[in-house]
Amino acid sequence: MHCAERLRTEERASPGLIACTAVHKPSKSTRIKPTKPHHTPSNSMESALKKDTESTCVLCCQDIDLFAVGKCDHPVCYRCSTKMRVLCEQKYCAVCREQLDKVVFLRKPEAFATLNIHHYQCEKKYDIYFGDGKVHAQFRKILLNECPHCPEPKVFSKFEELEQHMRKQHELFCCKLCLKHLKIFSYERKWYSRKDLARHRMQGDPDDTSHRGHPLCKFCDDRYLDNDELLKHLRRDHYFCHFCDADGAQEYYSDYQYLSEHFRESHYLCEEGRCSTEQFTHAFRTEIDYKAHKAAAHSKNRAEARQNRQIDIQFNYAPRQQRRNDVGGDDYEEVDRFNRQGRPGRGRGPGGQQNLRSWRYNREEEDREMAAAMRASMASHQEERSHAQERSMLKPRREEKLEPDETRNNRSTARPTNDTQARSMKSNGSLAGQDFPVLGAGAPPAPVQSMIQKPSVSLKEDDFPSLSGSVVSSPMTPAYTNQPRKHSSFQEEDFPALVSKIKPLKPQSSAASAWSQAGSKPVVAPNKPVVLPTKMTPMSSSSILSSTDPLPSASVPQPLTASSSRRKKMLTLTESHKDPPKIRCPSSSDDEDPHSGKTAQEIRTVPTMLDISTLLTVKGSSPQANPKASKKKKQTTASSLGSPSHTPETVSKMAHKENVPEKKPPETGLNKAPTAPKTNSIVNGVAEKPAEALSCTSFPENITSSKQPVTDQAPPSKEEEFPALISKKPPPGFKSAFPLRNSQSALPPPPPPGLGPAVSKPPPGFTGVPLNSNVEDSSVSAVNRPTPAIGSYLIPDHFQQRNMDLIQSIKNFLQNDETKFNEFKNYSGQFRQGALPAVQYYKSCQELLGENFNRVFNELLVLLPDTRKQQELLTAHGDFKALEKQQQGSKPKKSKKKAWQTGTSSSSSLDLDCQVCPTCKQVLALKDFNTHKTLHIGDDDFPSLQAISKIIS
């Protein structure tokens, strides 16, 4: 019977002892309380149980020879108490775990409170008191190291001496593991021969079935007491996978190399950068965690971060229900797949039910095929109709008459594309069919009637709103050199300039004949050189024709755009059949036909509708063209956009284009002046030889009071000659709206005061537009040249760490003075908020840091997260350096203002280790410039609308 059960039996049977025994609950302990015995018939049985309980140890369940009693009054045998206090060095009660400072060994159990321990013998080292000398002798005997095999007892002072004696004298050995972990007396040790010791270590003892040997660590080839000790060793000295361990797997690895292979095979292991030398932290359970780590720690740019954030997820959709009479994209795919596999015929199934199923399936397939065929037919029909419309646009209109306002508005609303394209192909006057001989060959054109006639319907000013709206809105989409061609859009290659539109309208006495006589140039004052616009970008196409009103041939001839040599040959053929003009220049080139019309050089320099619409861009507002016209205008460019070459004569001729009647200006008595020779024209980016001077001295010039001398225009820059090769520039058509940097040097001197022609009032239809404000002075335009827009701040690499290093450097230079550092932070905050100007901030920081300010200024400027504030601080630094050089007596080569307006060269001139981004104007360190430049790769191909609006504003 177990000792606890025996104690409970004694509690029920013996009224002399009140025992509360609970071995597993320390709060309820067994206490021996002396009570007065009741003399009942069962006293003899209770006394027997009492003796049995008192003679058995509750720990080792052996008979108690000597009792060990503490203040908790839980008696145990003296052997168990000695093991705990001497061998294990533990002084608590094994029953209730109460700390026992003193223990008394007695032959009979007594209450500890009744004992007078001061009269007992004592072992002060272990705080054990003995009831008499025999008890003390018995305590010392169980602690002796005595040889069990010698006939004569041999006692050794230490166990090591006994072990050596047993090995040498008796060739017996004890188990080292048992000796280390088992706290037992020397006489309880087992001694083995070599063979028995090996069996004990591997399998256990034959007489002790509870011991199954000591487990072996296969990594270290060492054995441990039991599995618990082996597990401690594995987790302390070897490696295990913390992912698999959380799932309950017990797998261990000898070193980290094998564990990393397990991470690589079963999990996700990062081996980039610093992670190749780290342990545990660079392994991840799932792919999501792995990619999140790569995006956070190893992404060098946005593209890699975006790639790392992508997760491959497969979705499995349930099959959709069969739809009836509903056709979708998947149905077309199913039809195509079904047709590729071979469509079976009807009724081929072996049985009636199979035929029924096959017939139903084919019925659905036929419905889907029918829907697909109808859709394809509608698309082809639409395409044919668009081609027919294109062909109809090639046929000239027999008559041209002015329409009422209501009819024209209705037509433009109902057919915006067709009406605009048709009106764009009209010329001033009635043109016969032979004027359009399949874009080239034909008979001489019929006489052209004058367009300056009284209209049948009175026109209102509202019919001619300003053109600036469309001009401003048109460049919102950048023009690209390689644009997809639509079926319904007309390109320049389809409609080259027709020579019939350039034929003069009037004899030499008409006011509009100056366009044809002088090569489509206004006549200037005598001996004034004229530089004509010679650049036509490749994007100038027939979209001008399709988006503007009819052009009078006498006032504004069609420009010859730089497209191909084939088109030039066509023009030569068509011009050869024209009637000779009334007045020709006798000094024309020898290569030209004397009976031909205008030369290609003259045609190329004729202003276009875009020139005239640009004339109203400066301060006026323009009419909103239809959507088709606006889209086509985005692909056009004009060499004279925004240039001051537009005169009131141009405005008066524009009135002819808009079908607005205008009175003829009176002729003046000024002497005629020969025109200046033309500059080299550029077609398709190739400079041609200039034609000979077309000035004549035999015909009178009709210079009215509404005409002004034409000012020179800047020669085409290198960027404008090849607009498709320039990336960081405004779209074609808006480059020339702003004069170039050195445009002032090419301008001729203005006429003397008083000799400039007066400006007449604007023509009818343009009264709401202040024309005088449209002609800008080139000097003003040069000053107001737009600078690249300042972009948002893009954070460089290691931004946080560099900020911390910068703060630490500033603290070190300030000698860790918190007052000065707080003052520096206050200055920085005021500068960021705009309360402190950059110059004052620069001086304040220089006063705080002294000479050390130059050491931290470069990093302070680069890490300033505001591009505009960076430029201000950079300018302040440049001003200070320039002032410092002036004080030293050295004069700078350039003015301060220009030196700081040169972008990237400014930082190098100031000995700064930084560079300014030409795109967003952010100041960058040299090591960050290449990484920052890659962020703008896509910006050149797709500029933002805000950036373009800033350019044109």
UniProtKB/Swiss-Prot annotation:
Compositionally biased tracts (Basic and acidic residues): 381-409, 655-666
Family to which the UniProt record says this protein belongs: Belongs to the ZNF598/HEL2 family.
Name of the encoding gene: znf598
A molecular function (GO) term: ubiquitin protein ligase activity
CDD domains in UniProt: RING-HC_ZNF598
Stretches with biased composition (Basic residues): 25-39
Record-level GO cellular component terms: cytosol
C2H2-type ZnF: 215-238
Keyword line: Cytoplasm, Metal-binding, Phosphoprotein, Transferase, Translation regulation, Ubl conjugation pathway, Zinc, Zinc-finger
Zinc finger (RING-type): 57-97
Skewed-composition ranges (Low complexity): 371-380, 508-518, 536-553
Matches recorded under PANTHER family: E3 UBIQUITIN-PROTEIN LIGASE ZNF598, ZINC FINGER PROTEIN 598
Pathway membership, UniProt: Protein modification; protein ubiquitination
Role of this protein: E3 ubiquitin-protein ligase that plays a key role in the ribosome quality control (RQC), a pathway that takes place when a ribosome has stalled during translation, leading to degradation of nascent peptide chains. ZNF598 is activated when ribosomes are stalled within an mRNA following translation of prematurely polyadenylated mRNAs. Acts as a ribosome collision sensor: specifically recognizes and binds collided di-ribosome, which arises when a trailing ribosome encounters a slower leading ribosome, leading to terminally arrest translation.
UniProt feature, compositional bias: Polar residues: 410-431, 467-483, 555-564, 641-650, 695-711, 770-779
Sites of Phosphoserine modification: 489
Protein name: E3 ubiquitin-protein ligase ZNF598
Biased composition (Pro residues): 747-765
Subcellular localization, as worded in the UniProt entry: Cytoplasm, Cytosol
Region (Disordered): 25-47, 299-779, 884-911
EC number(s) given by UniProt: 2.3.2.27
Reactions it catalyzes: S-ubiquitinyl-[E2 ubiquitin-conjugating enzyme]-L-cysteine + [acceptor protein]-L-lysine = [E2 ubiquitin-conjugating enzyme]-L-cysteine + N(6)-ubiquitinyl-[acceptor protein]-L-lysine
GO biological process assignments: protein K63-linked ubiquitination; protein monoubiquitination; protein ubiquitination; regulation of translation; rescue of stalled ribosome; ribosome-associated ubiquitin-dependent protein catabolic process
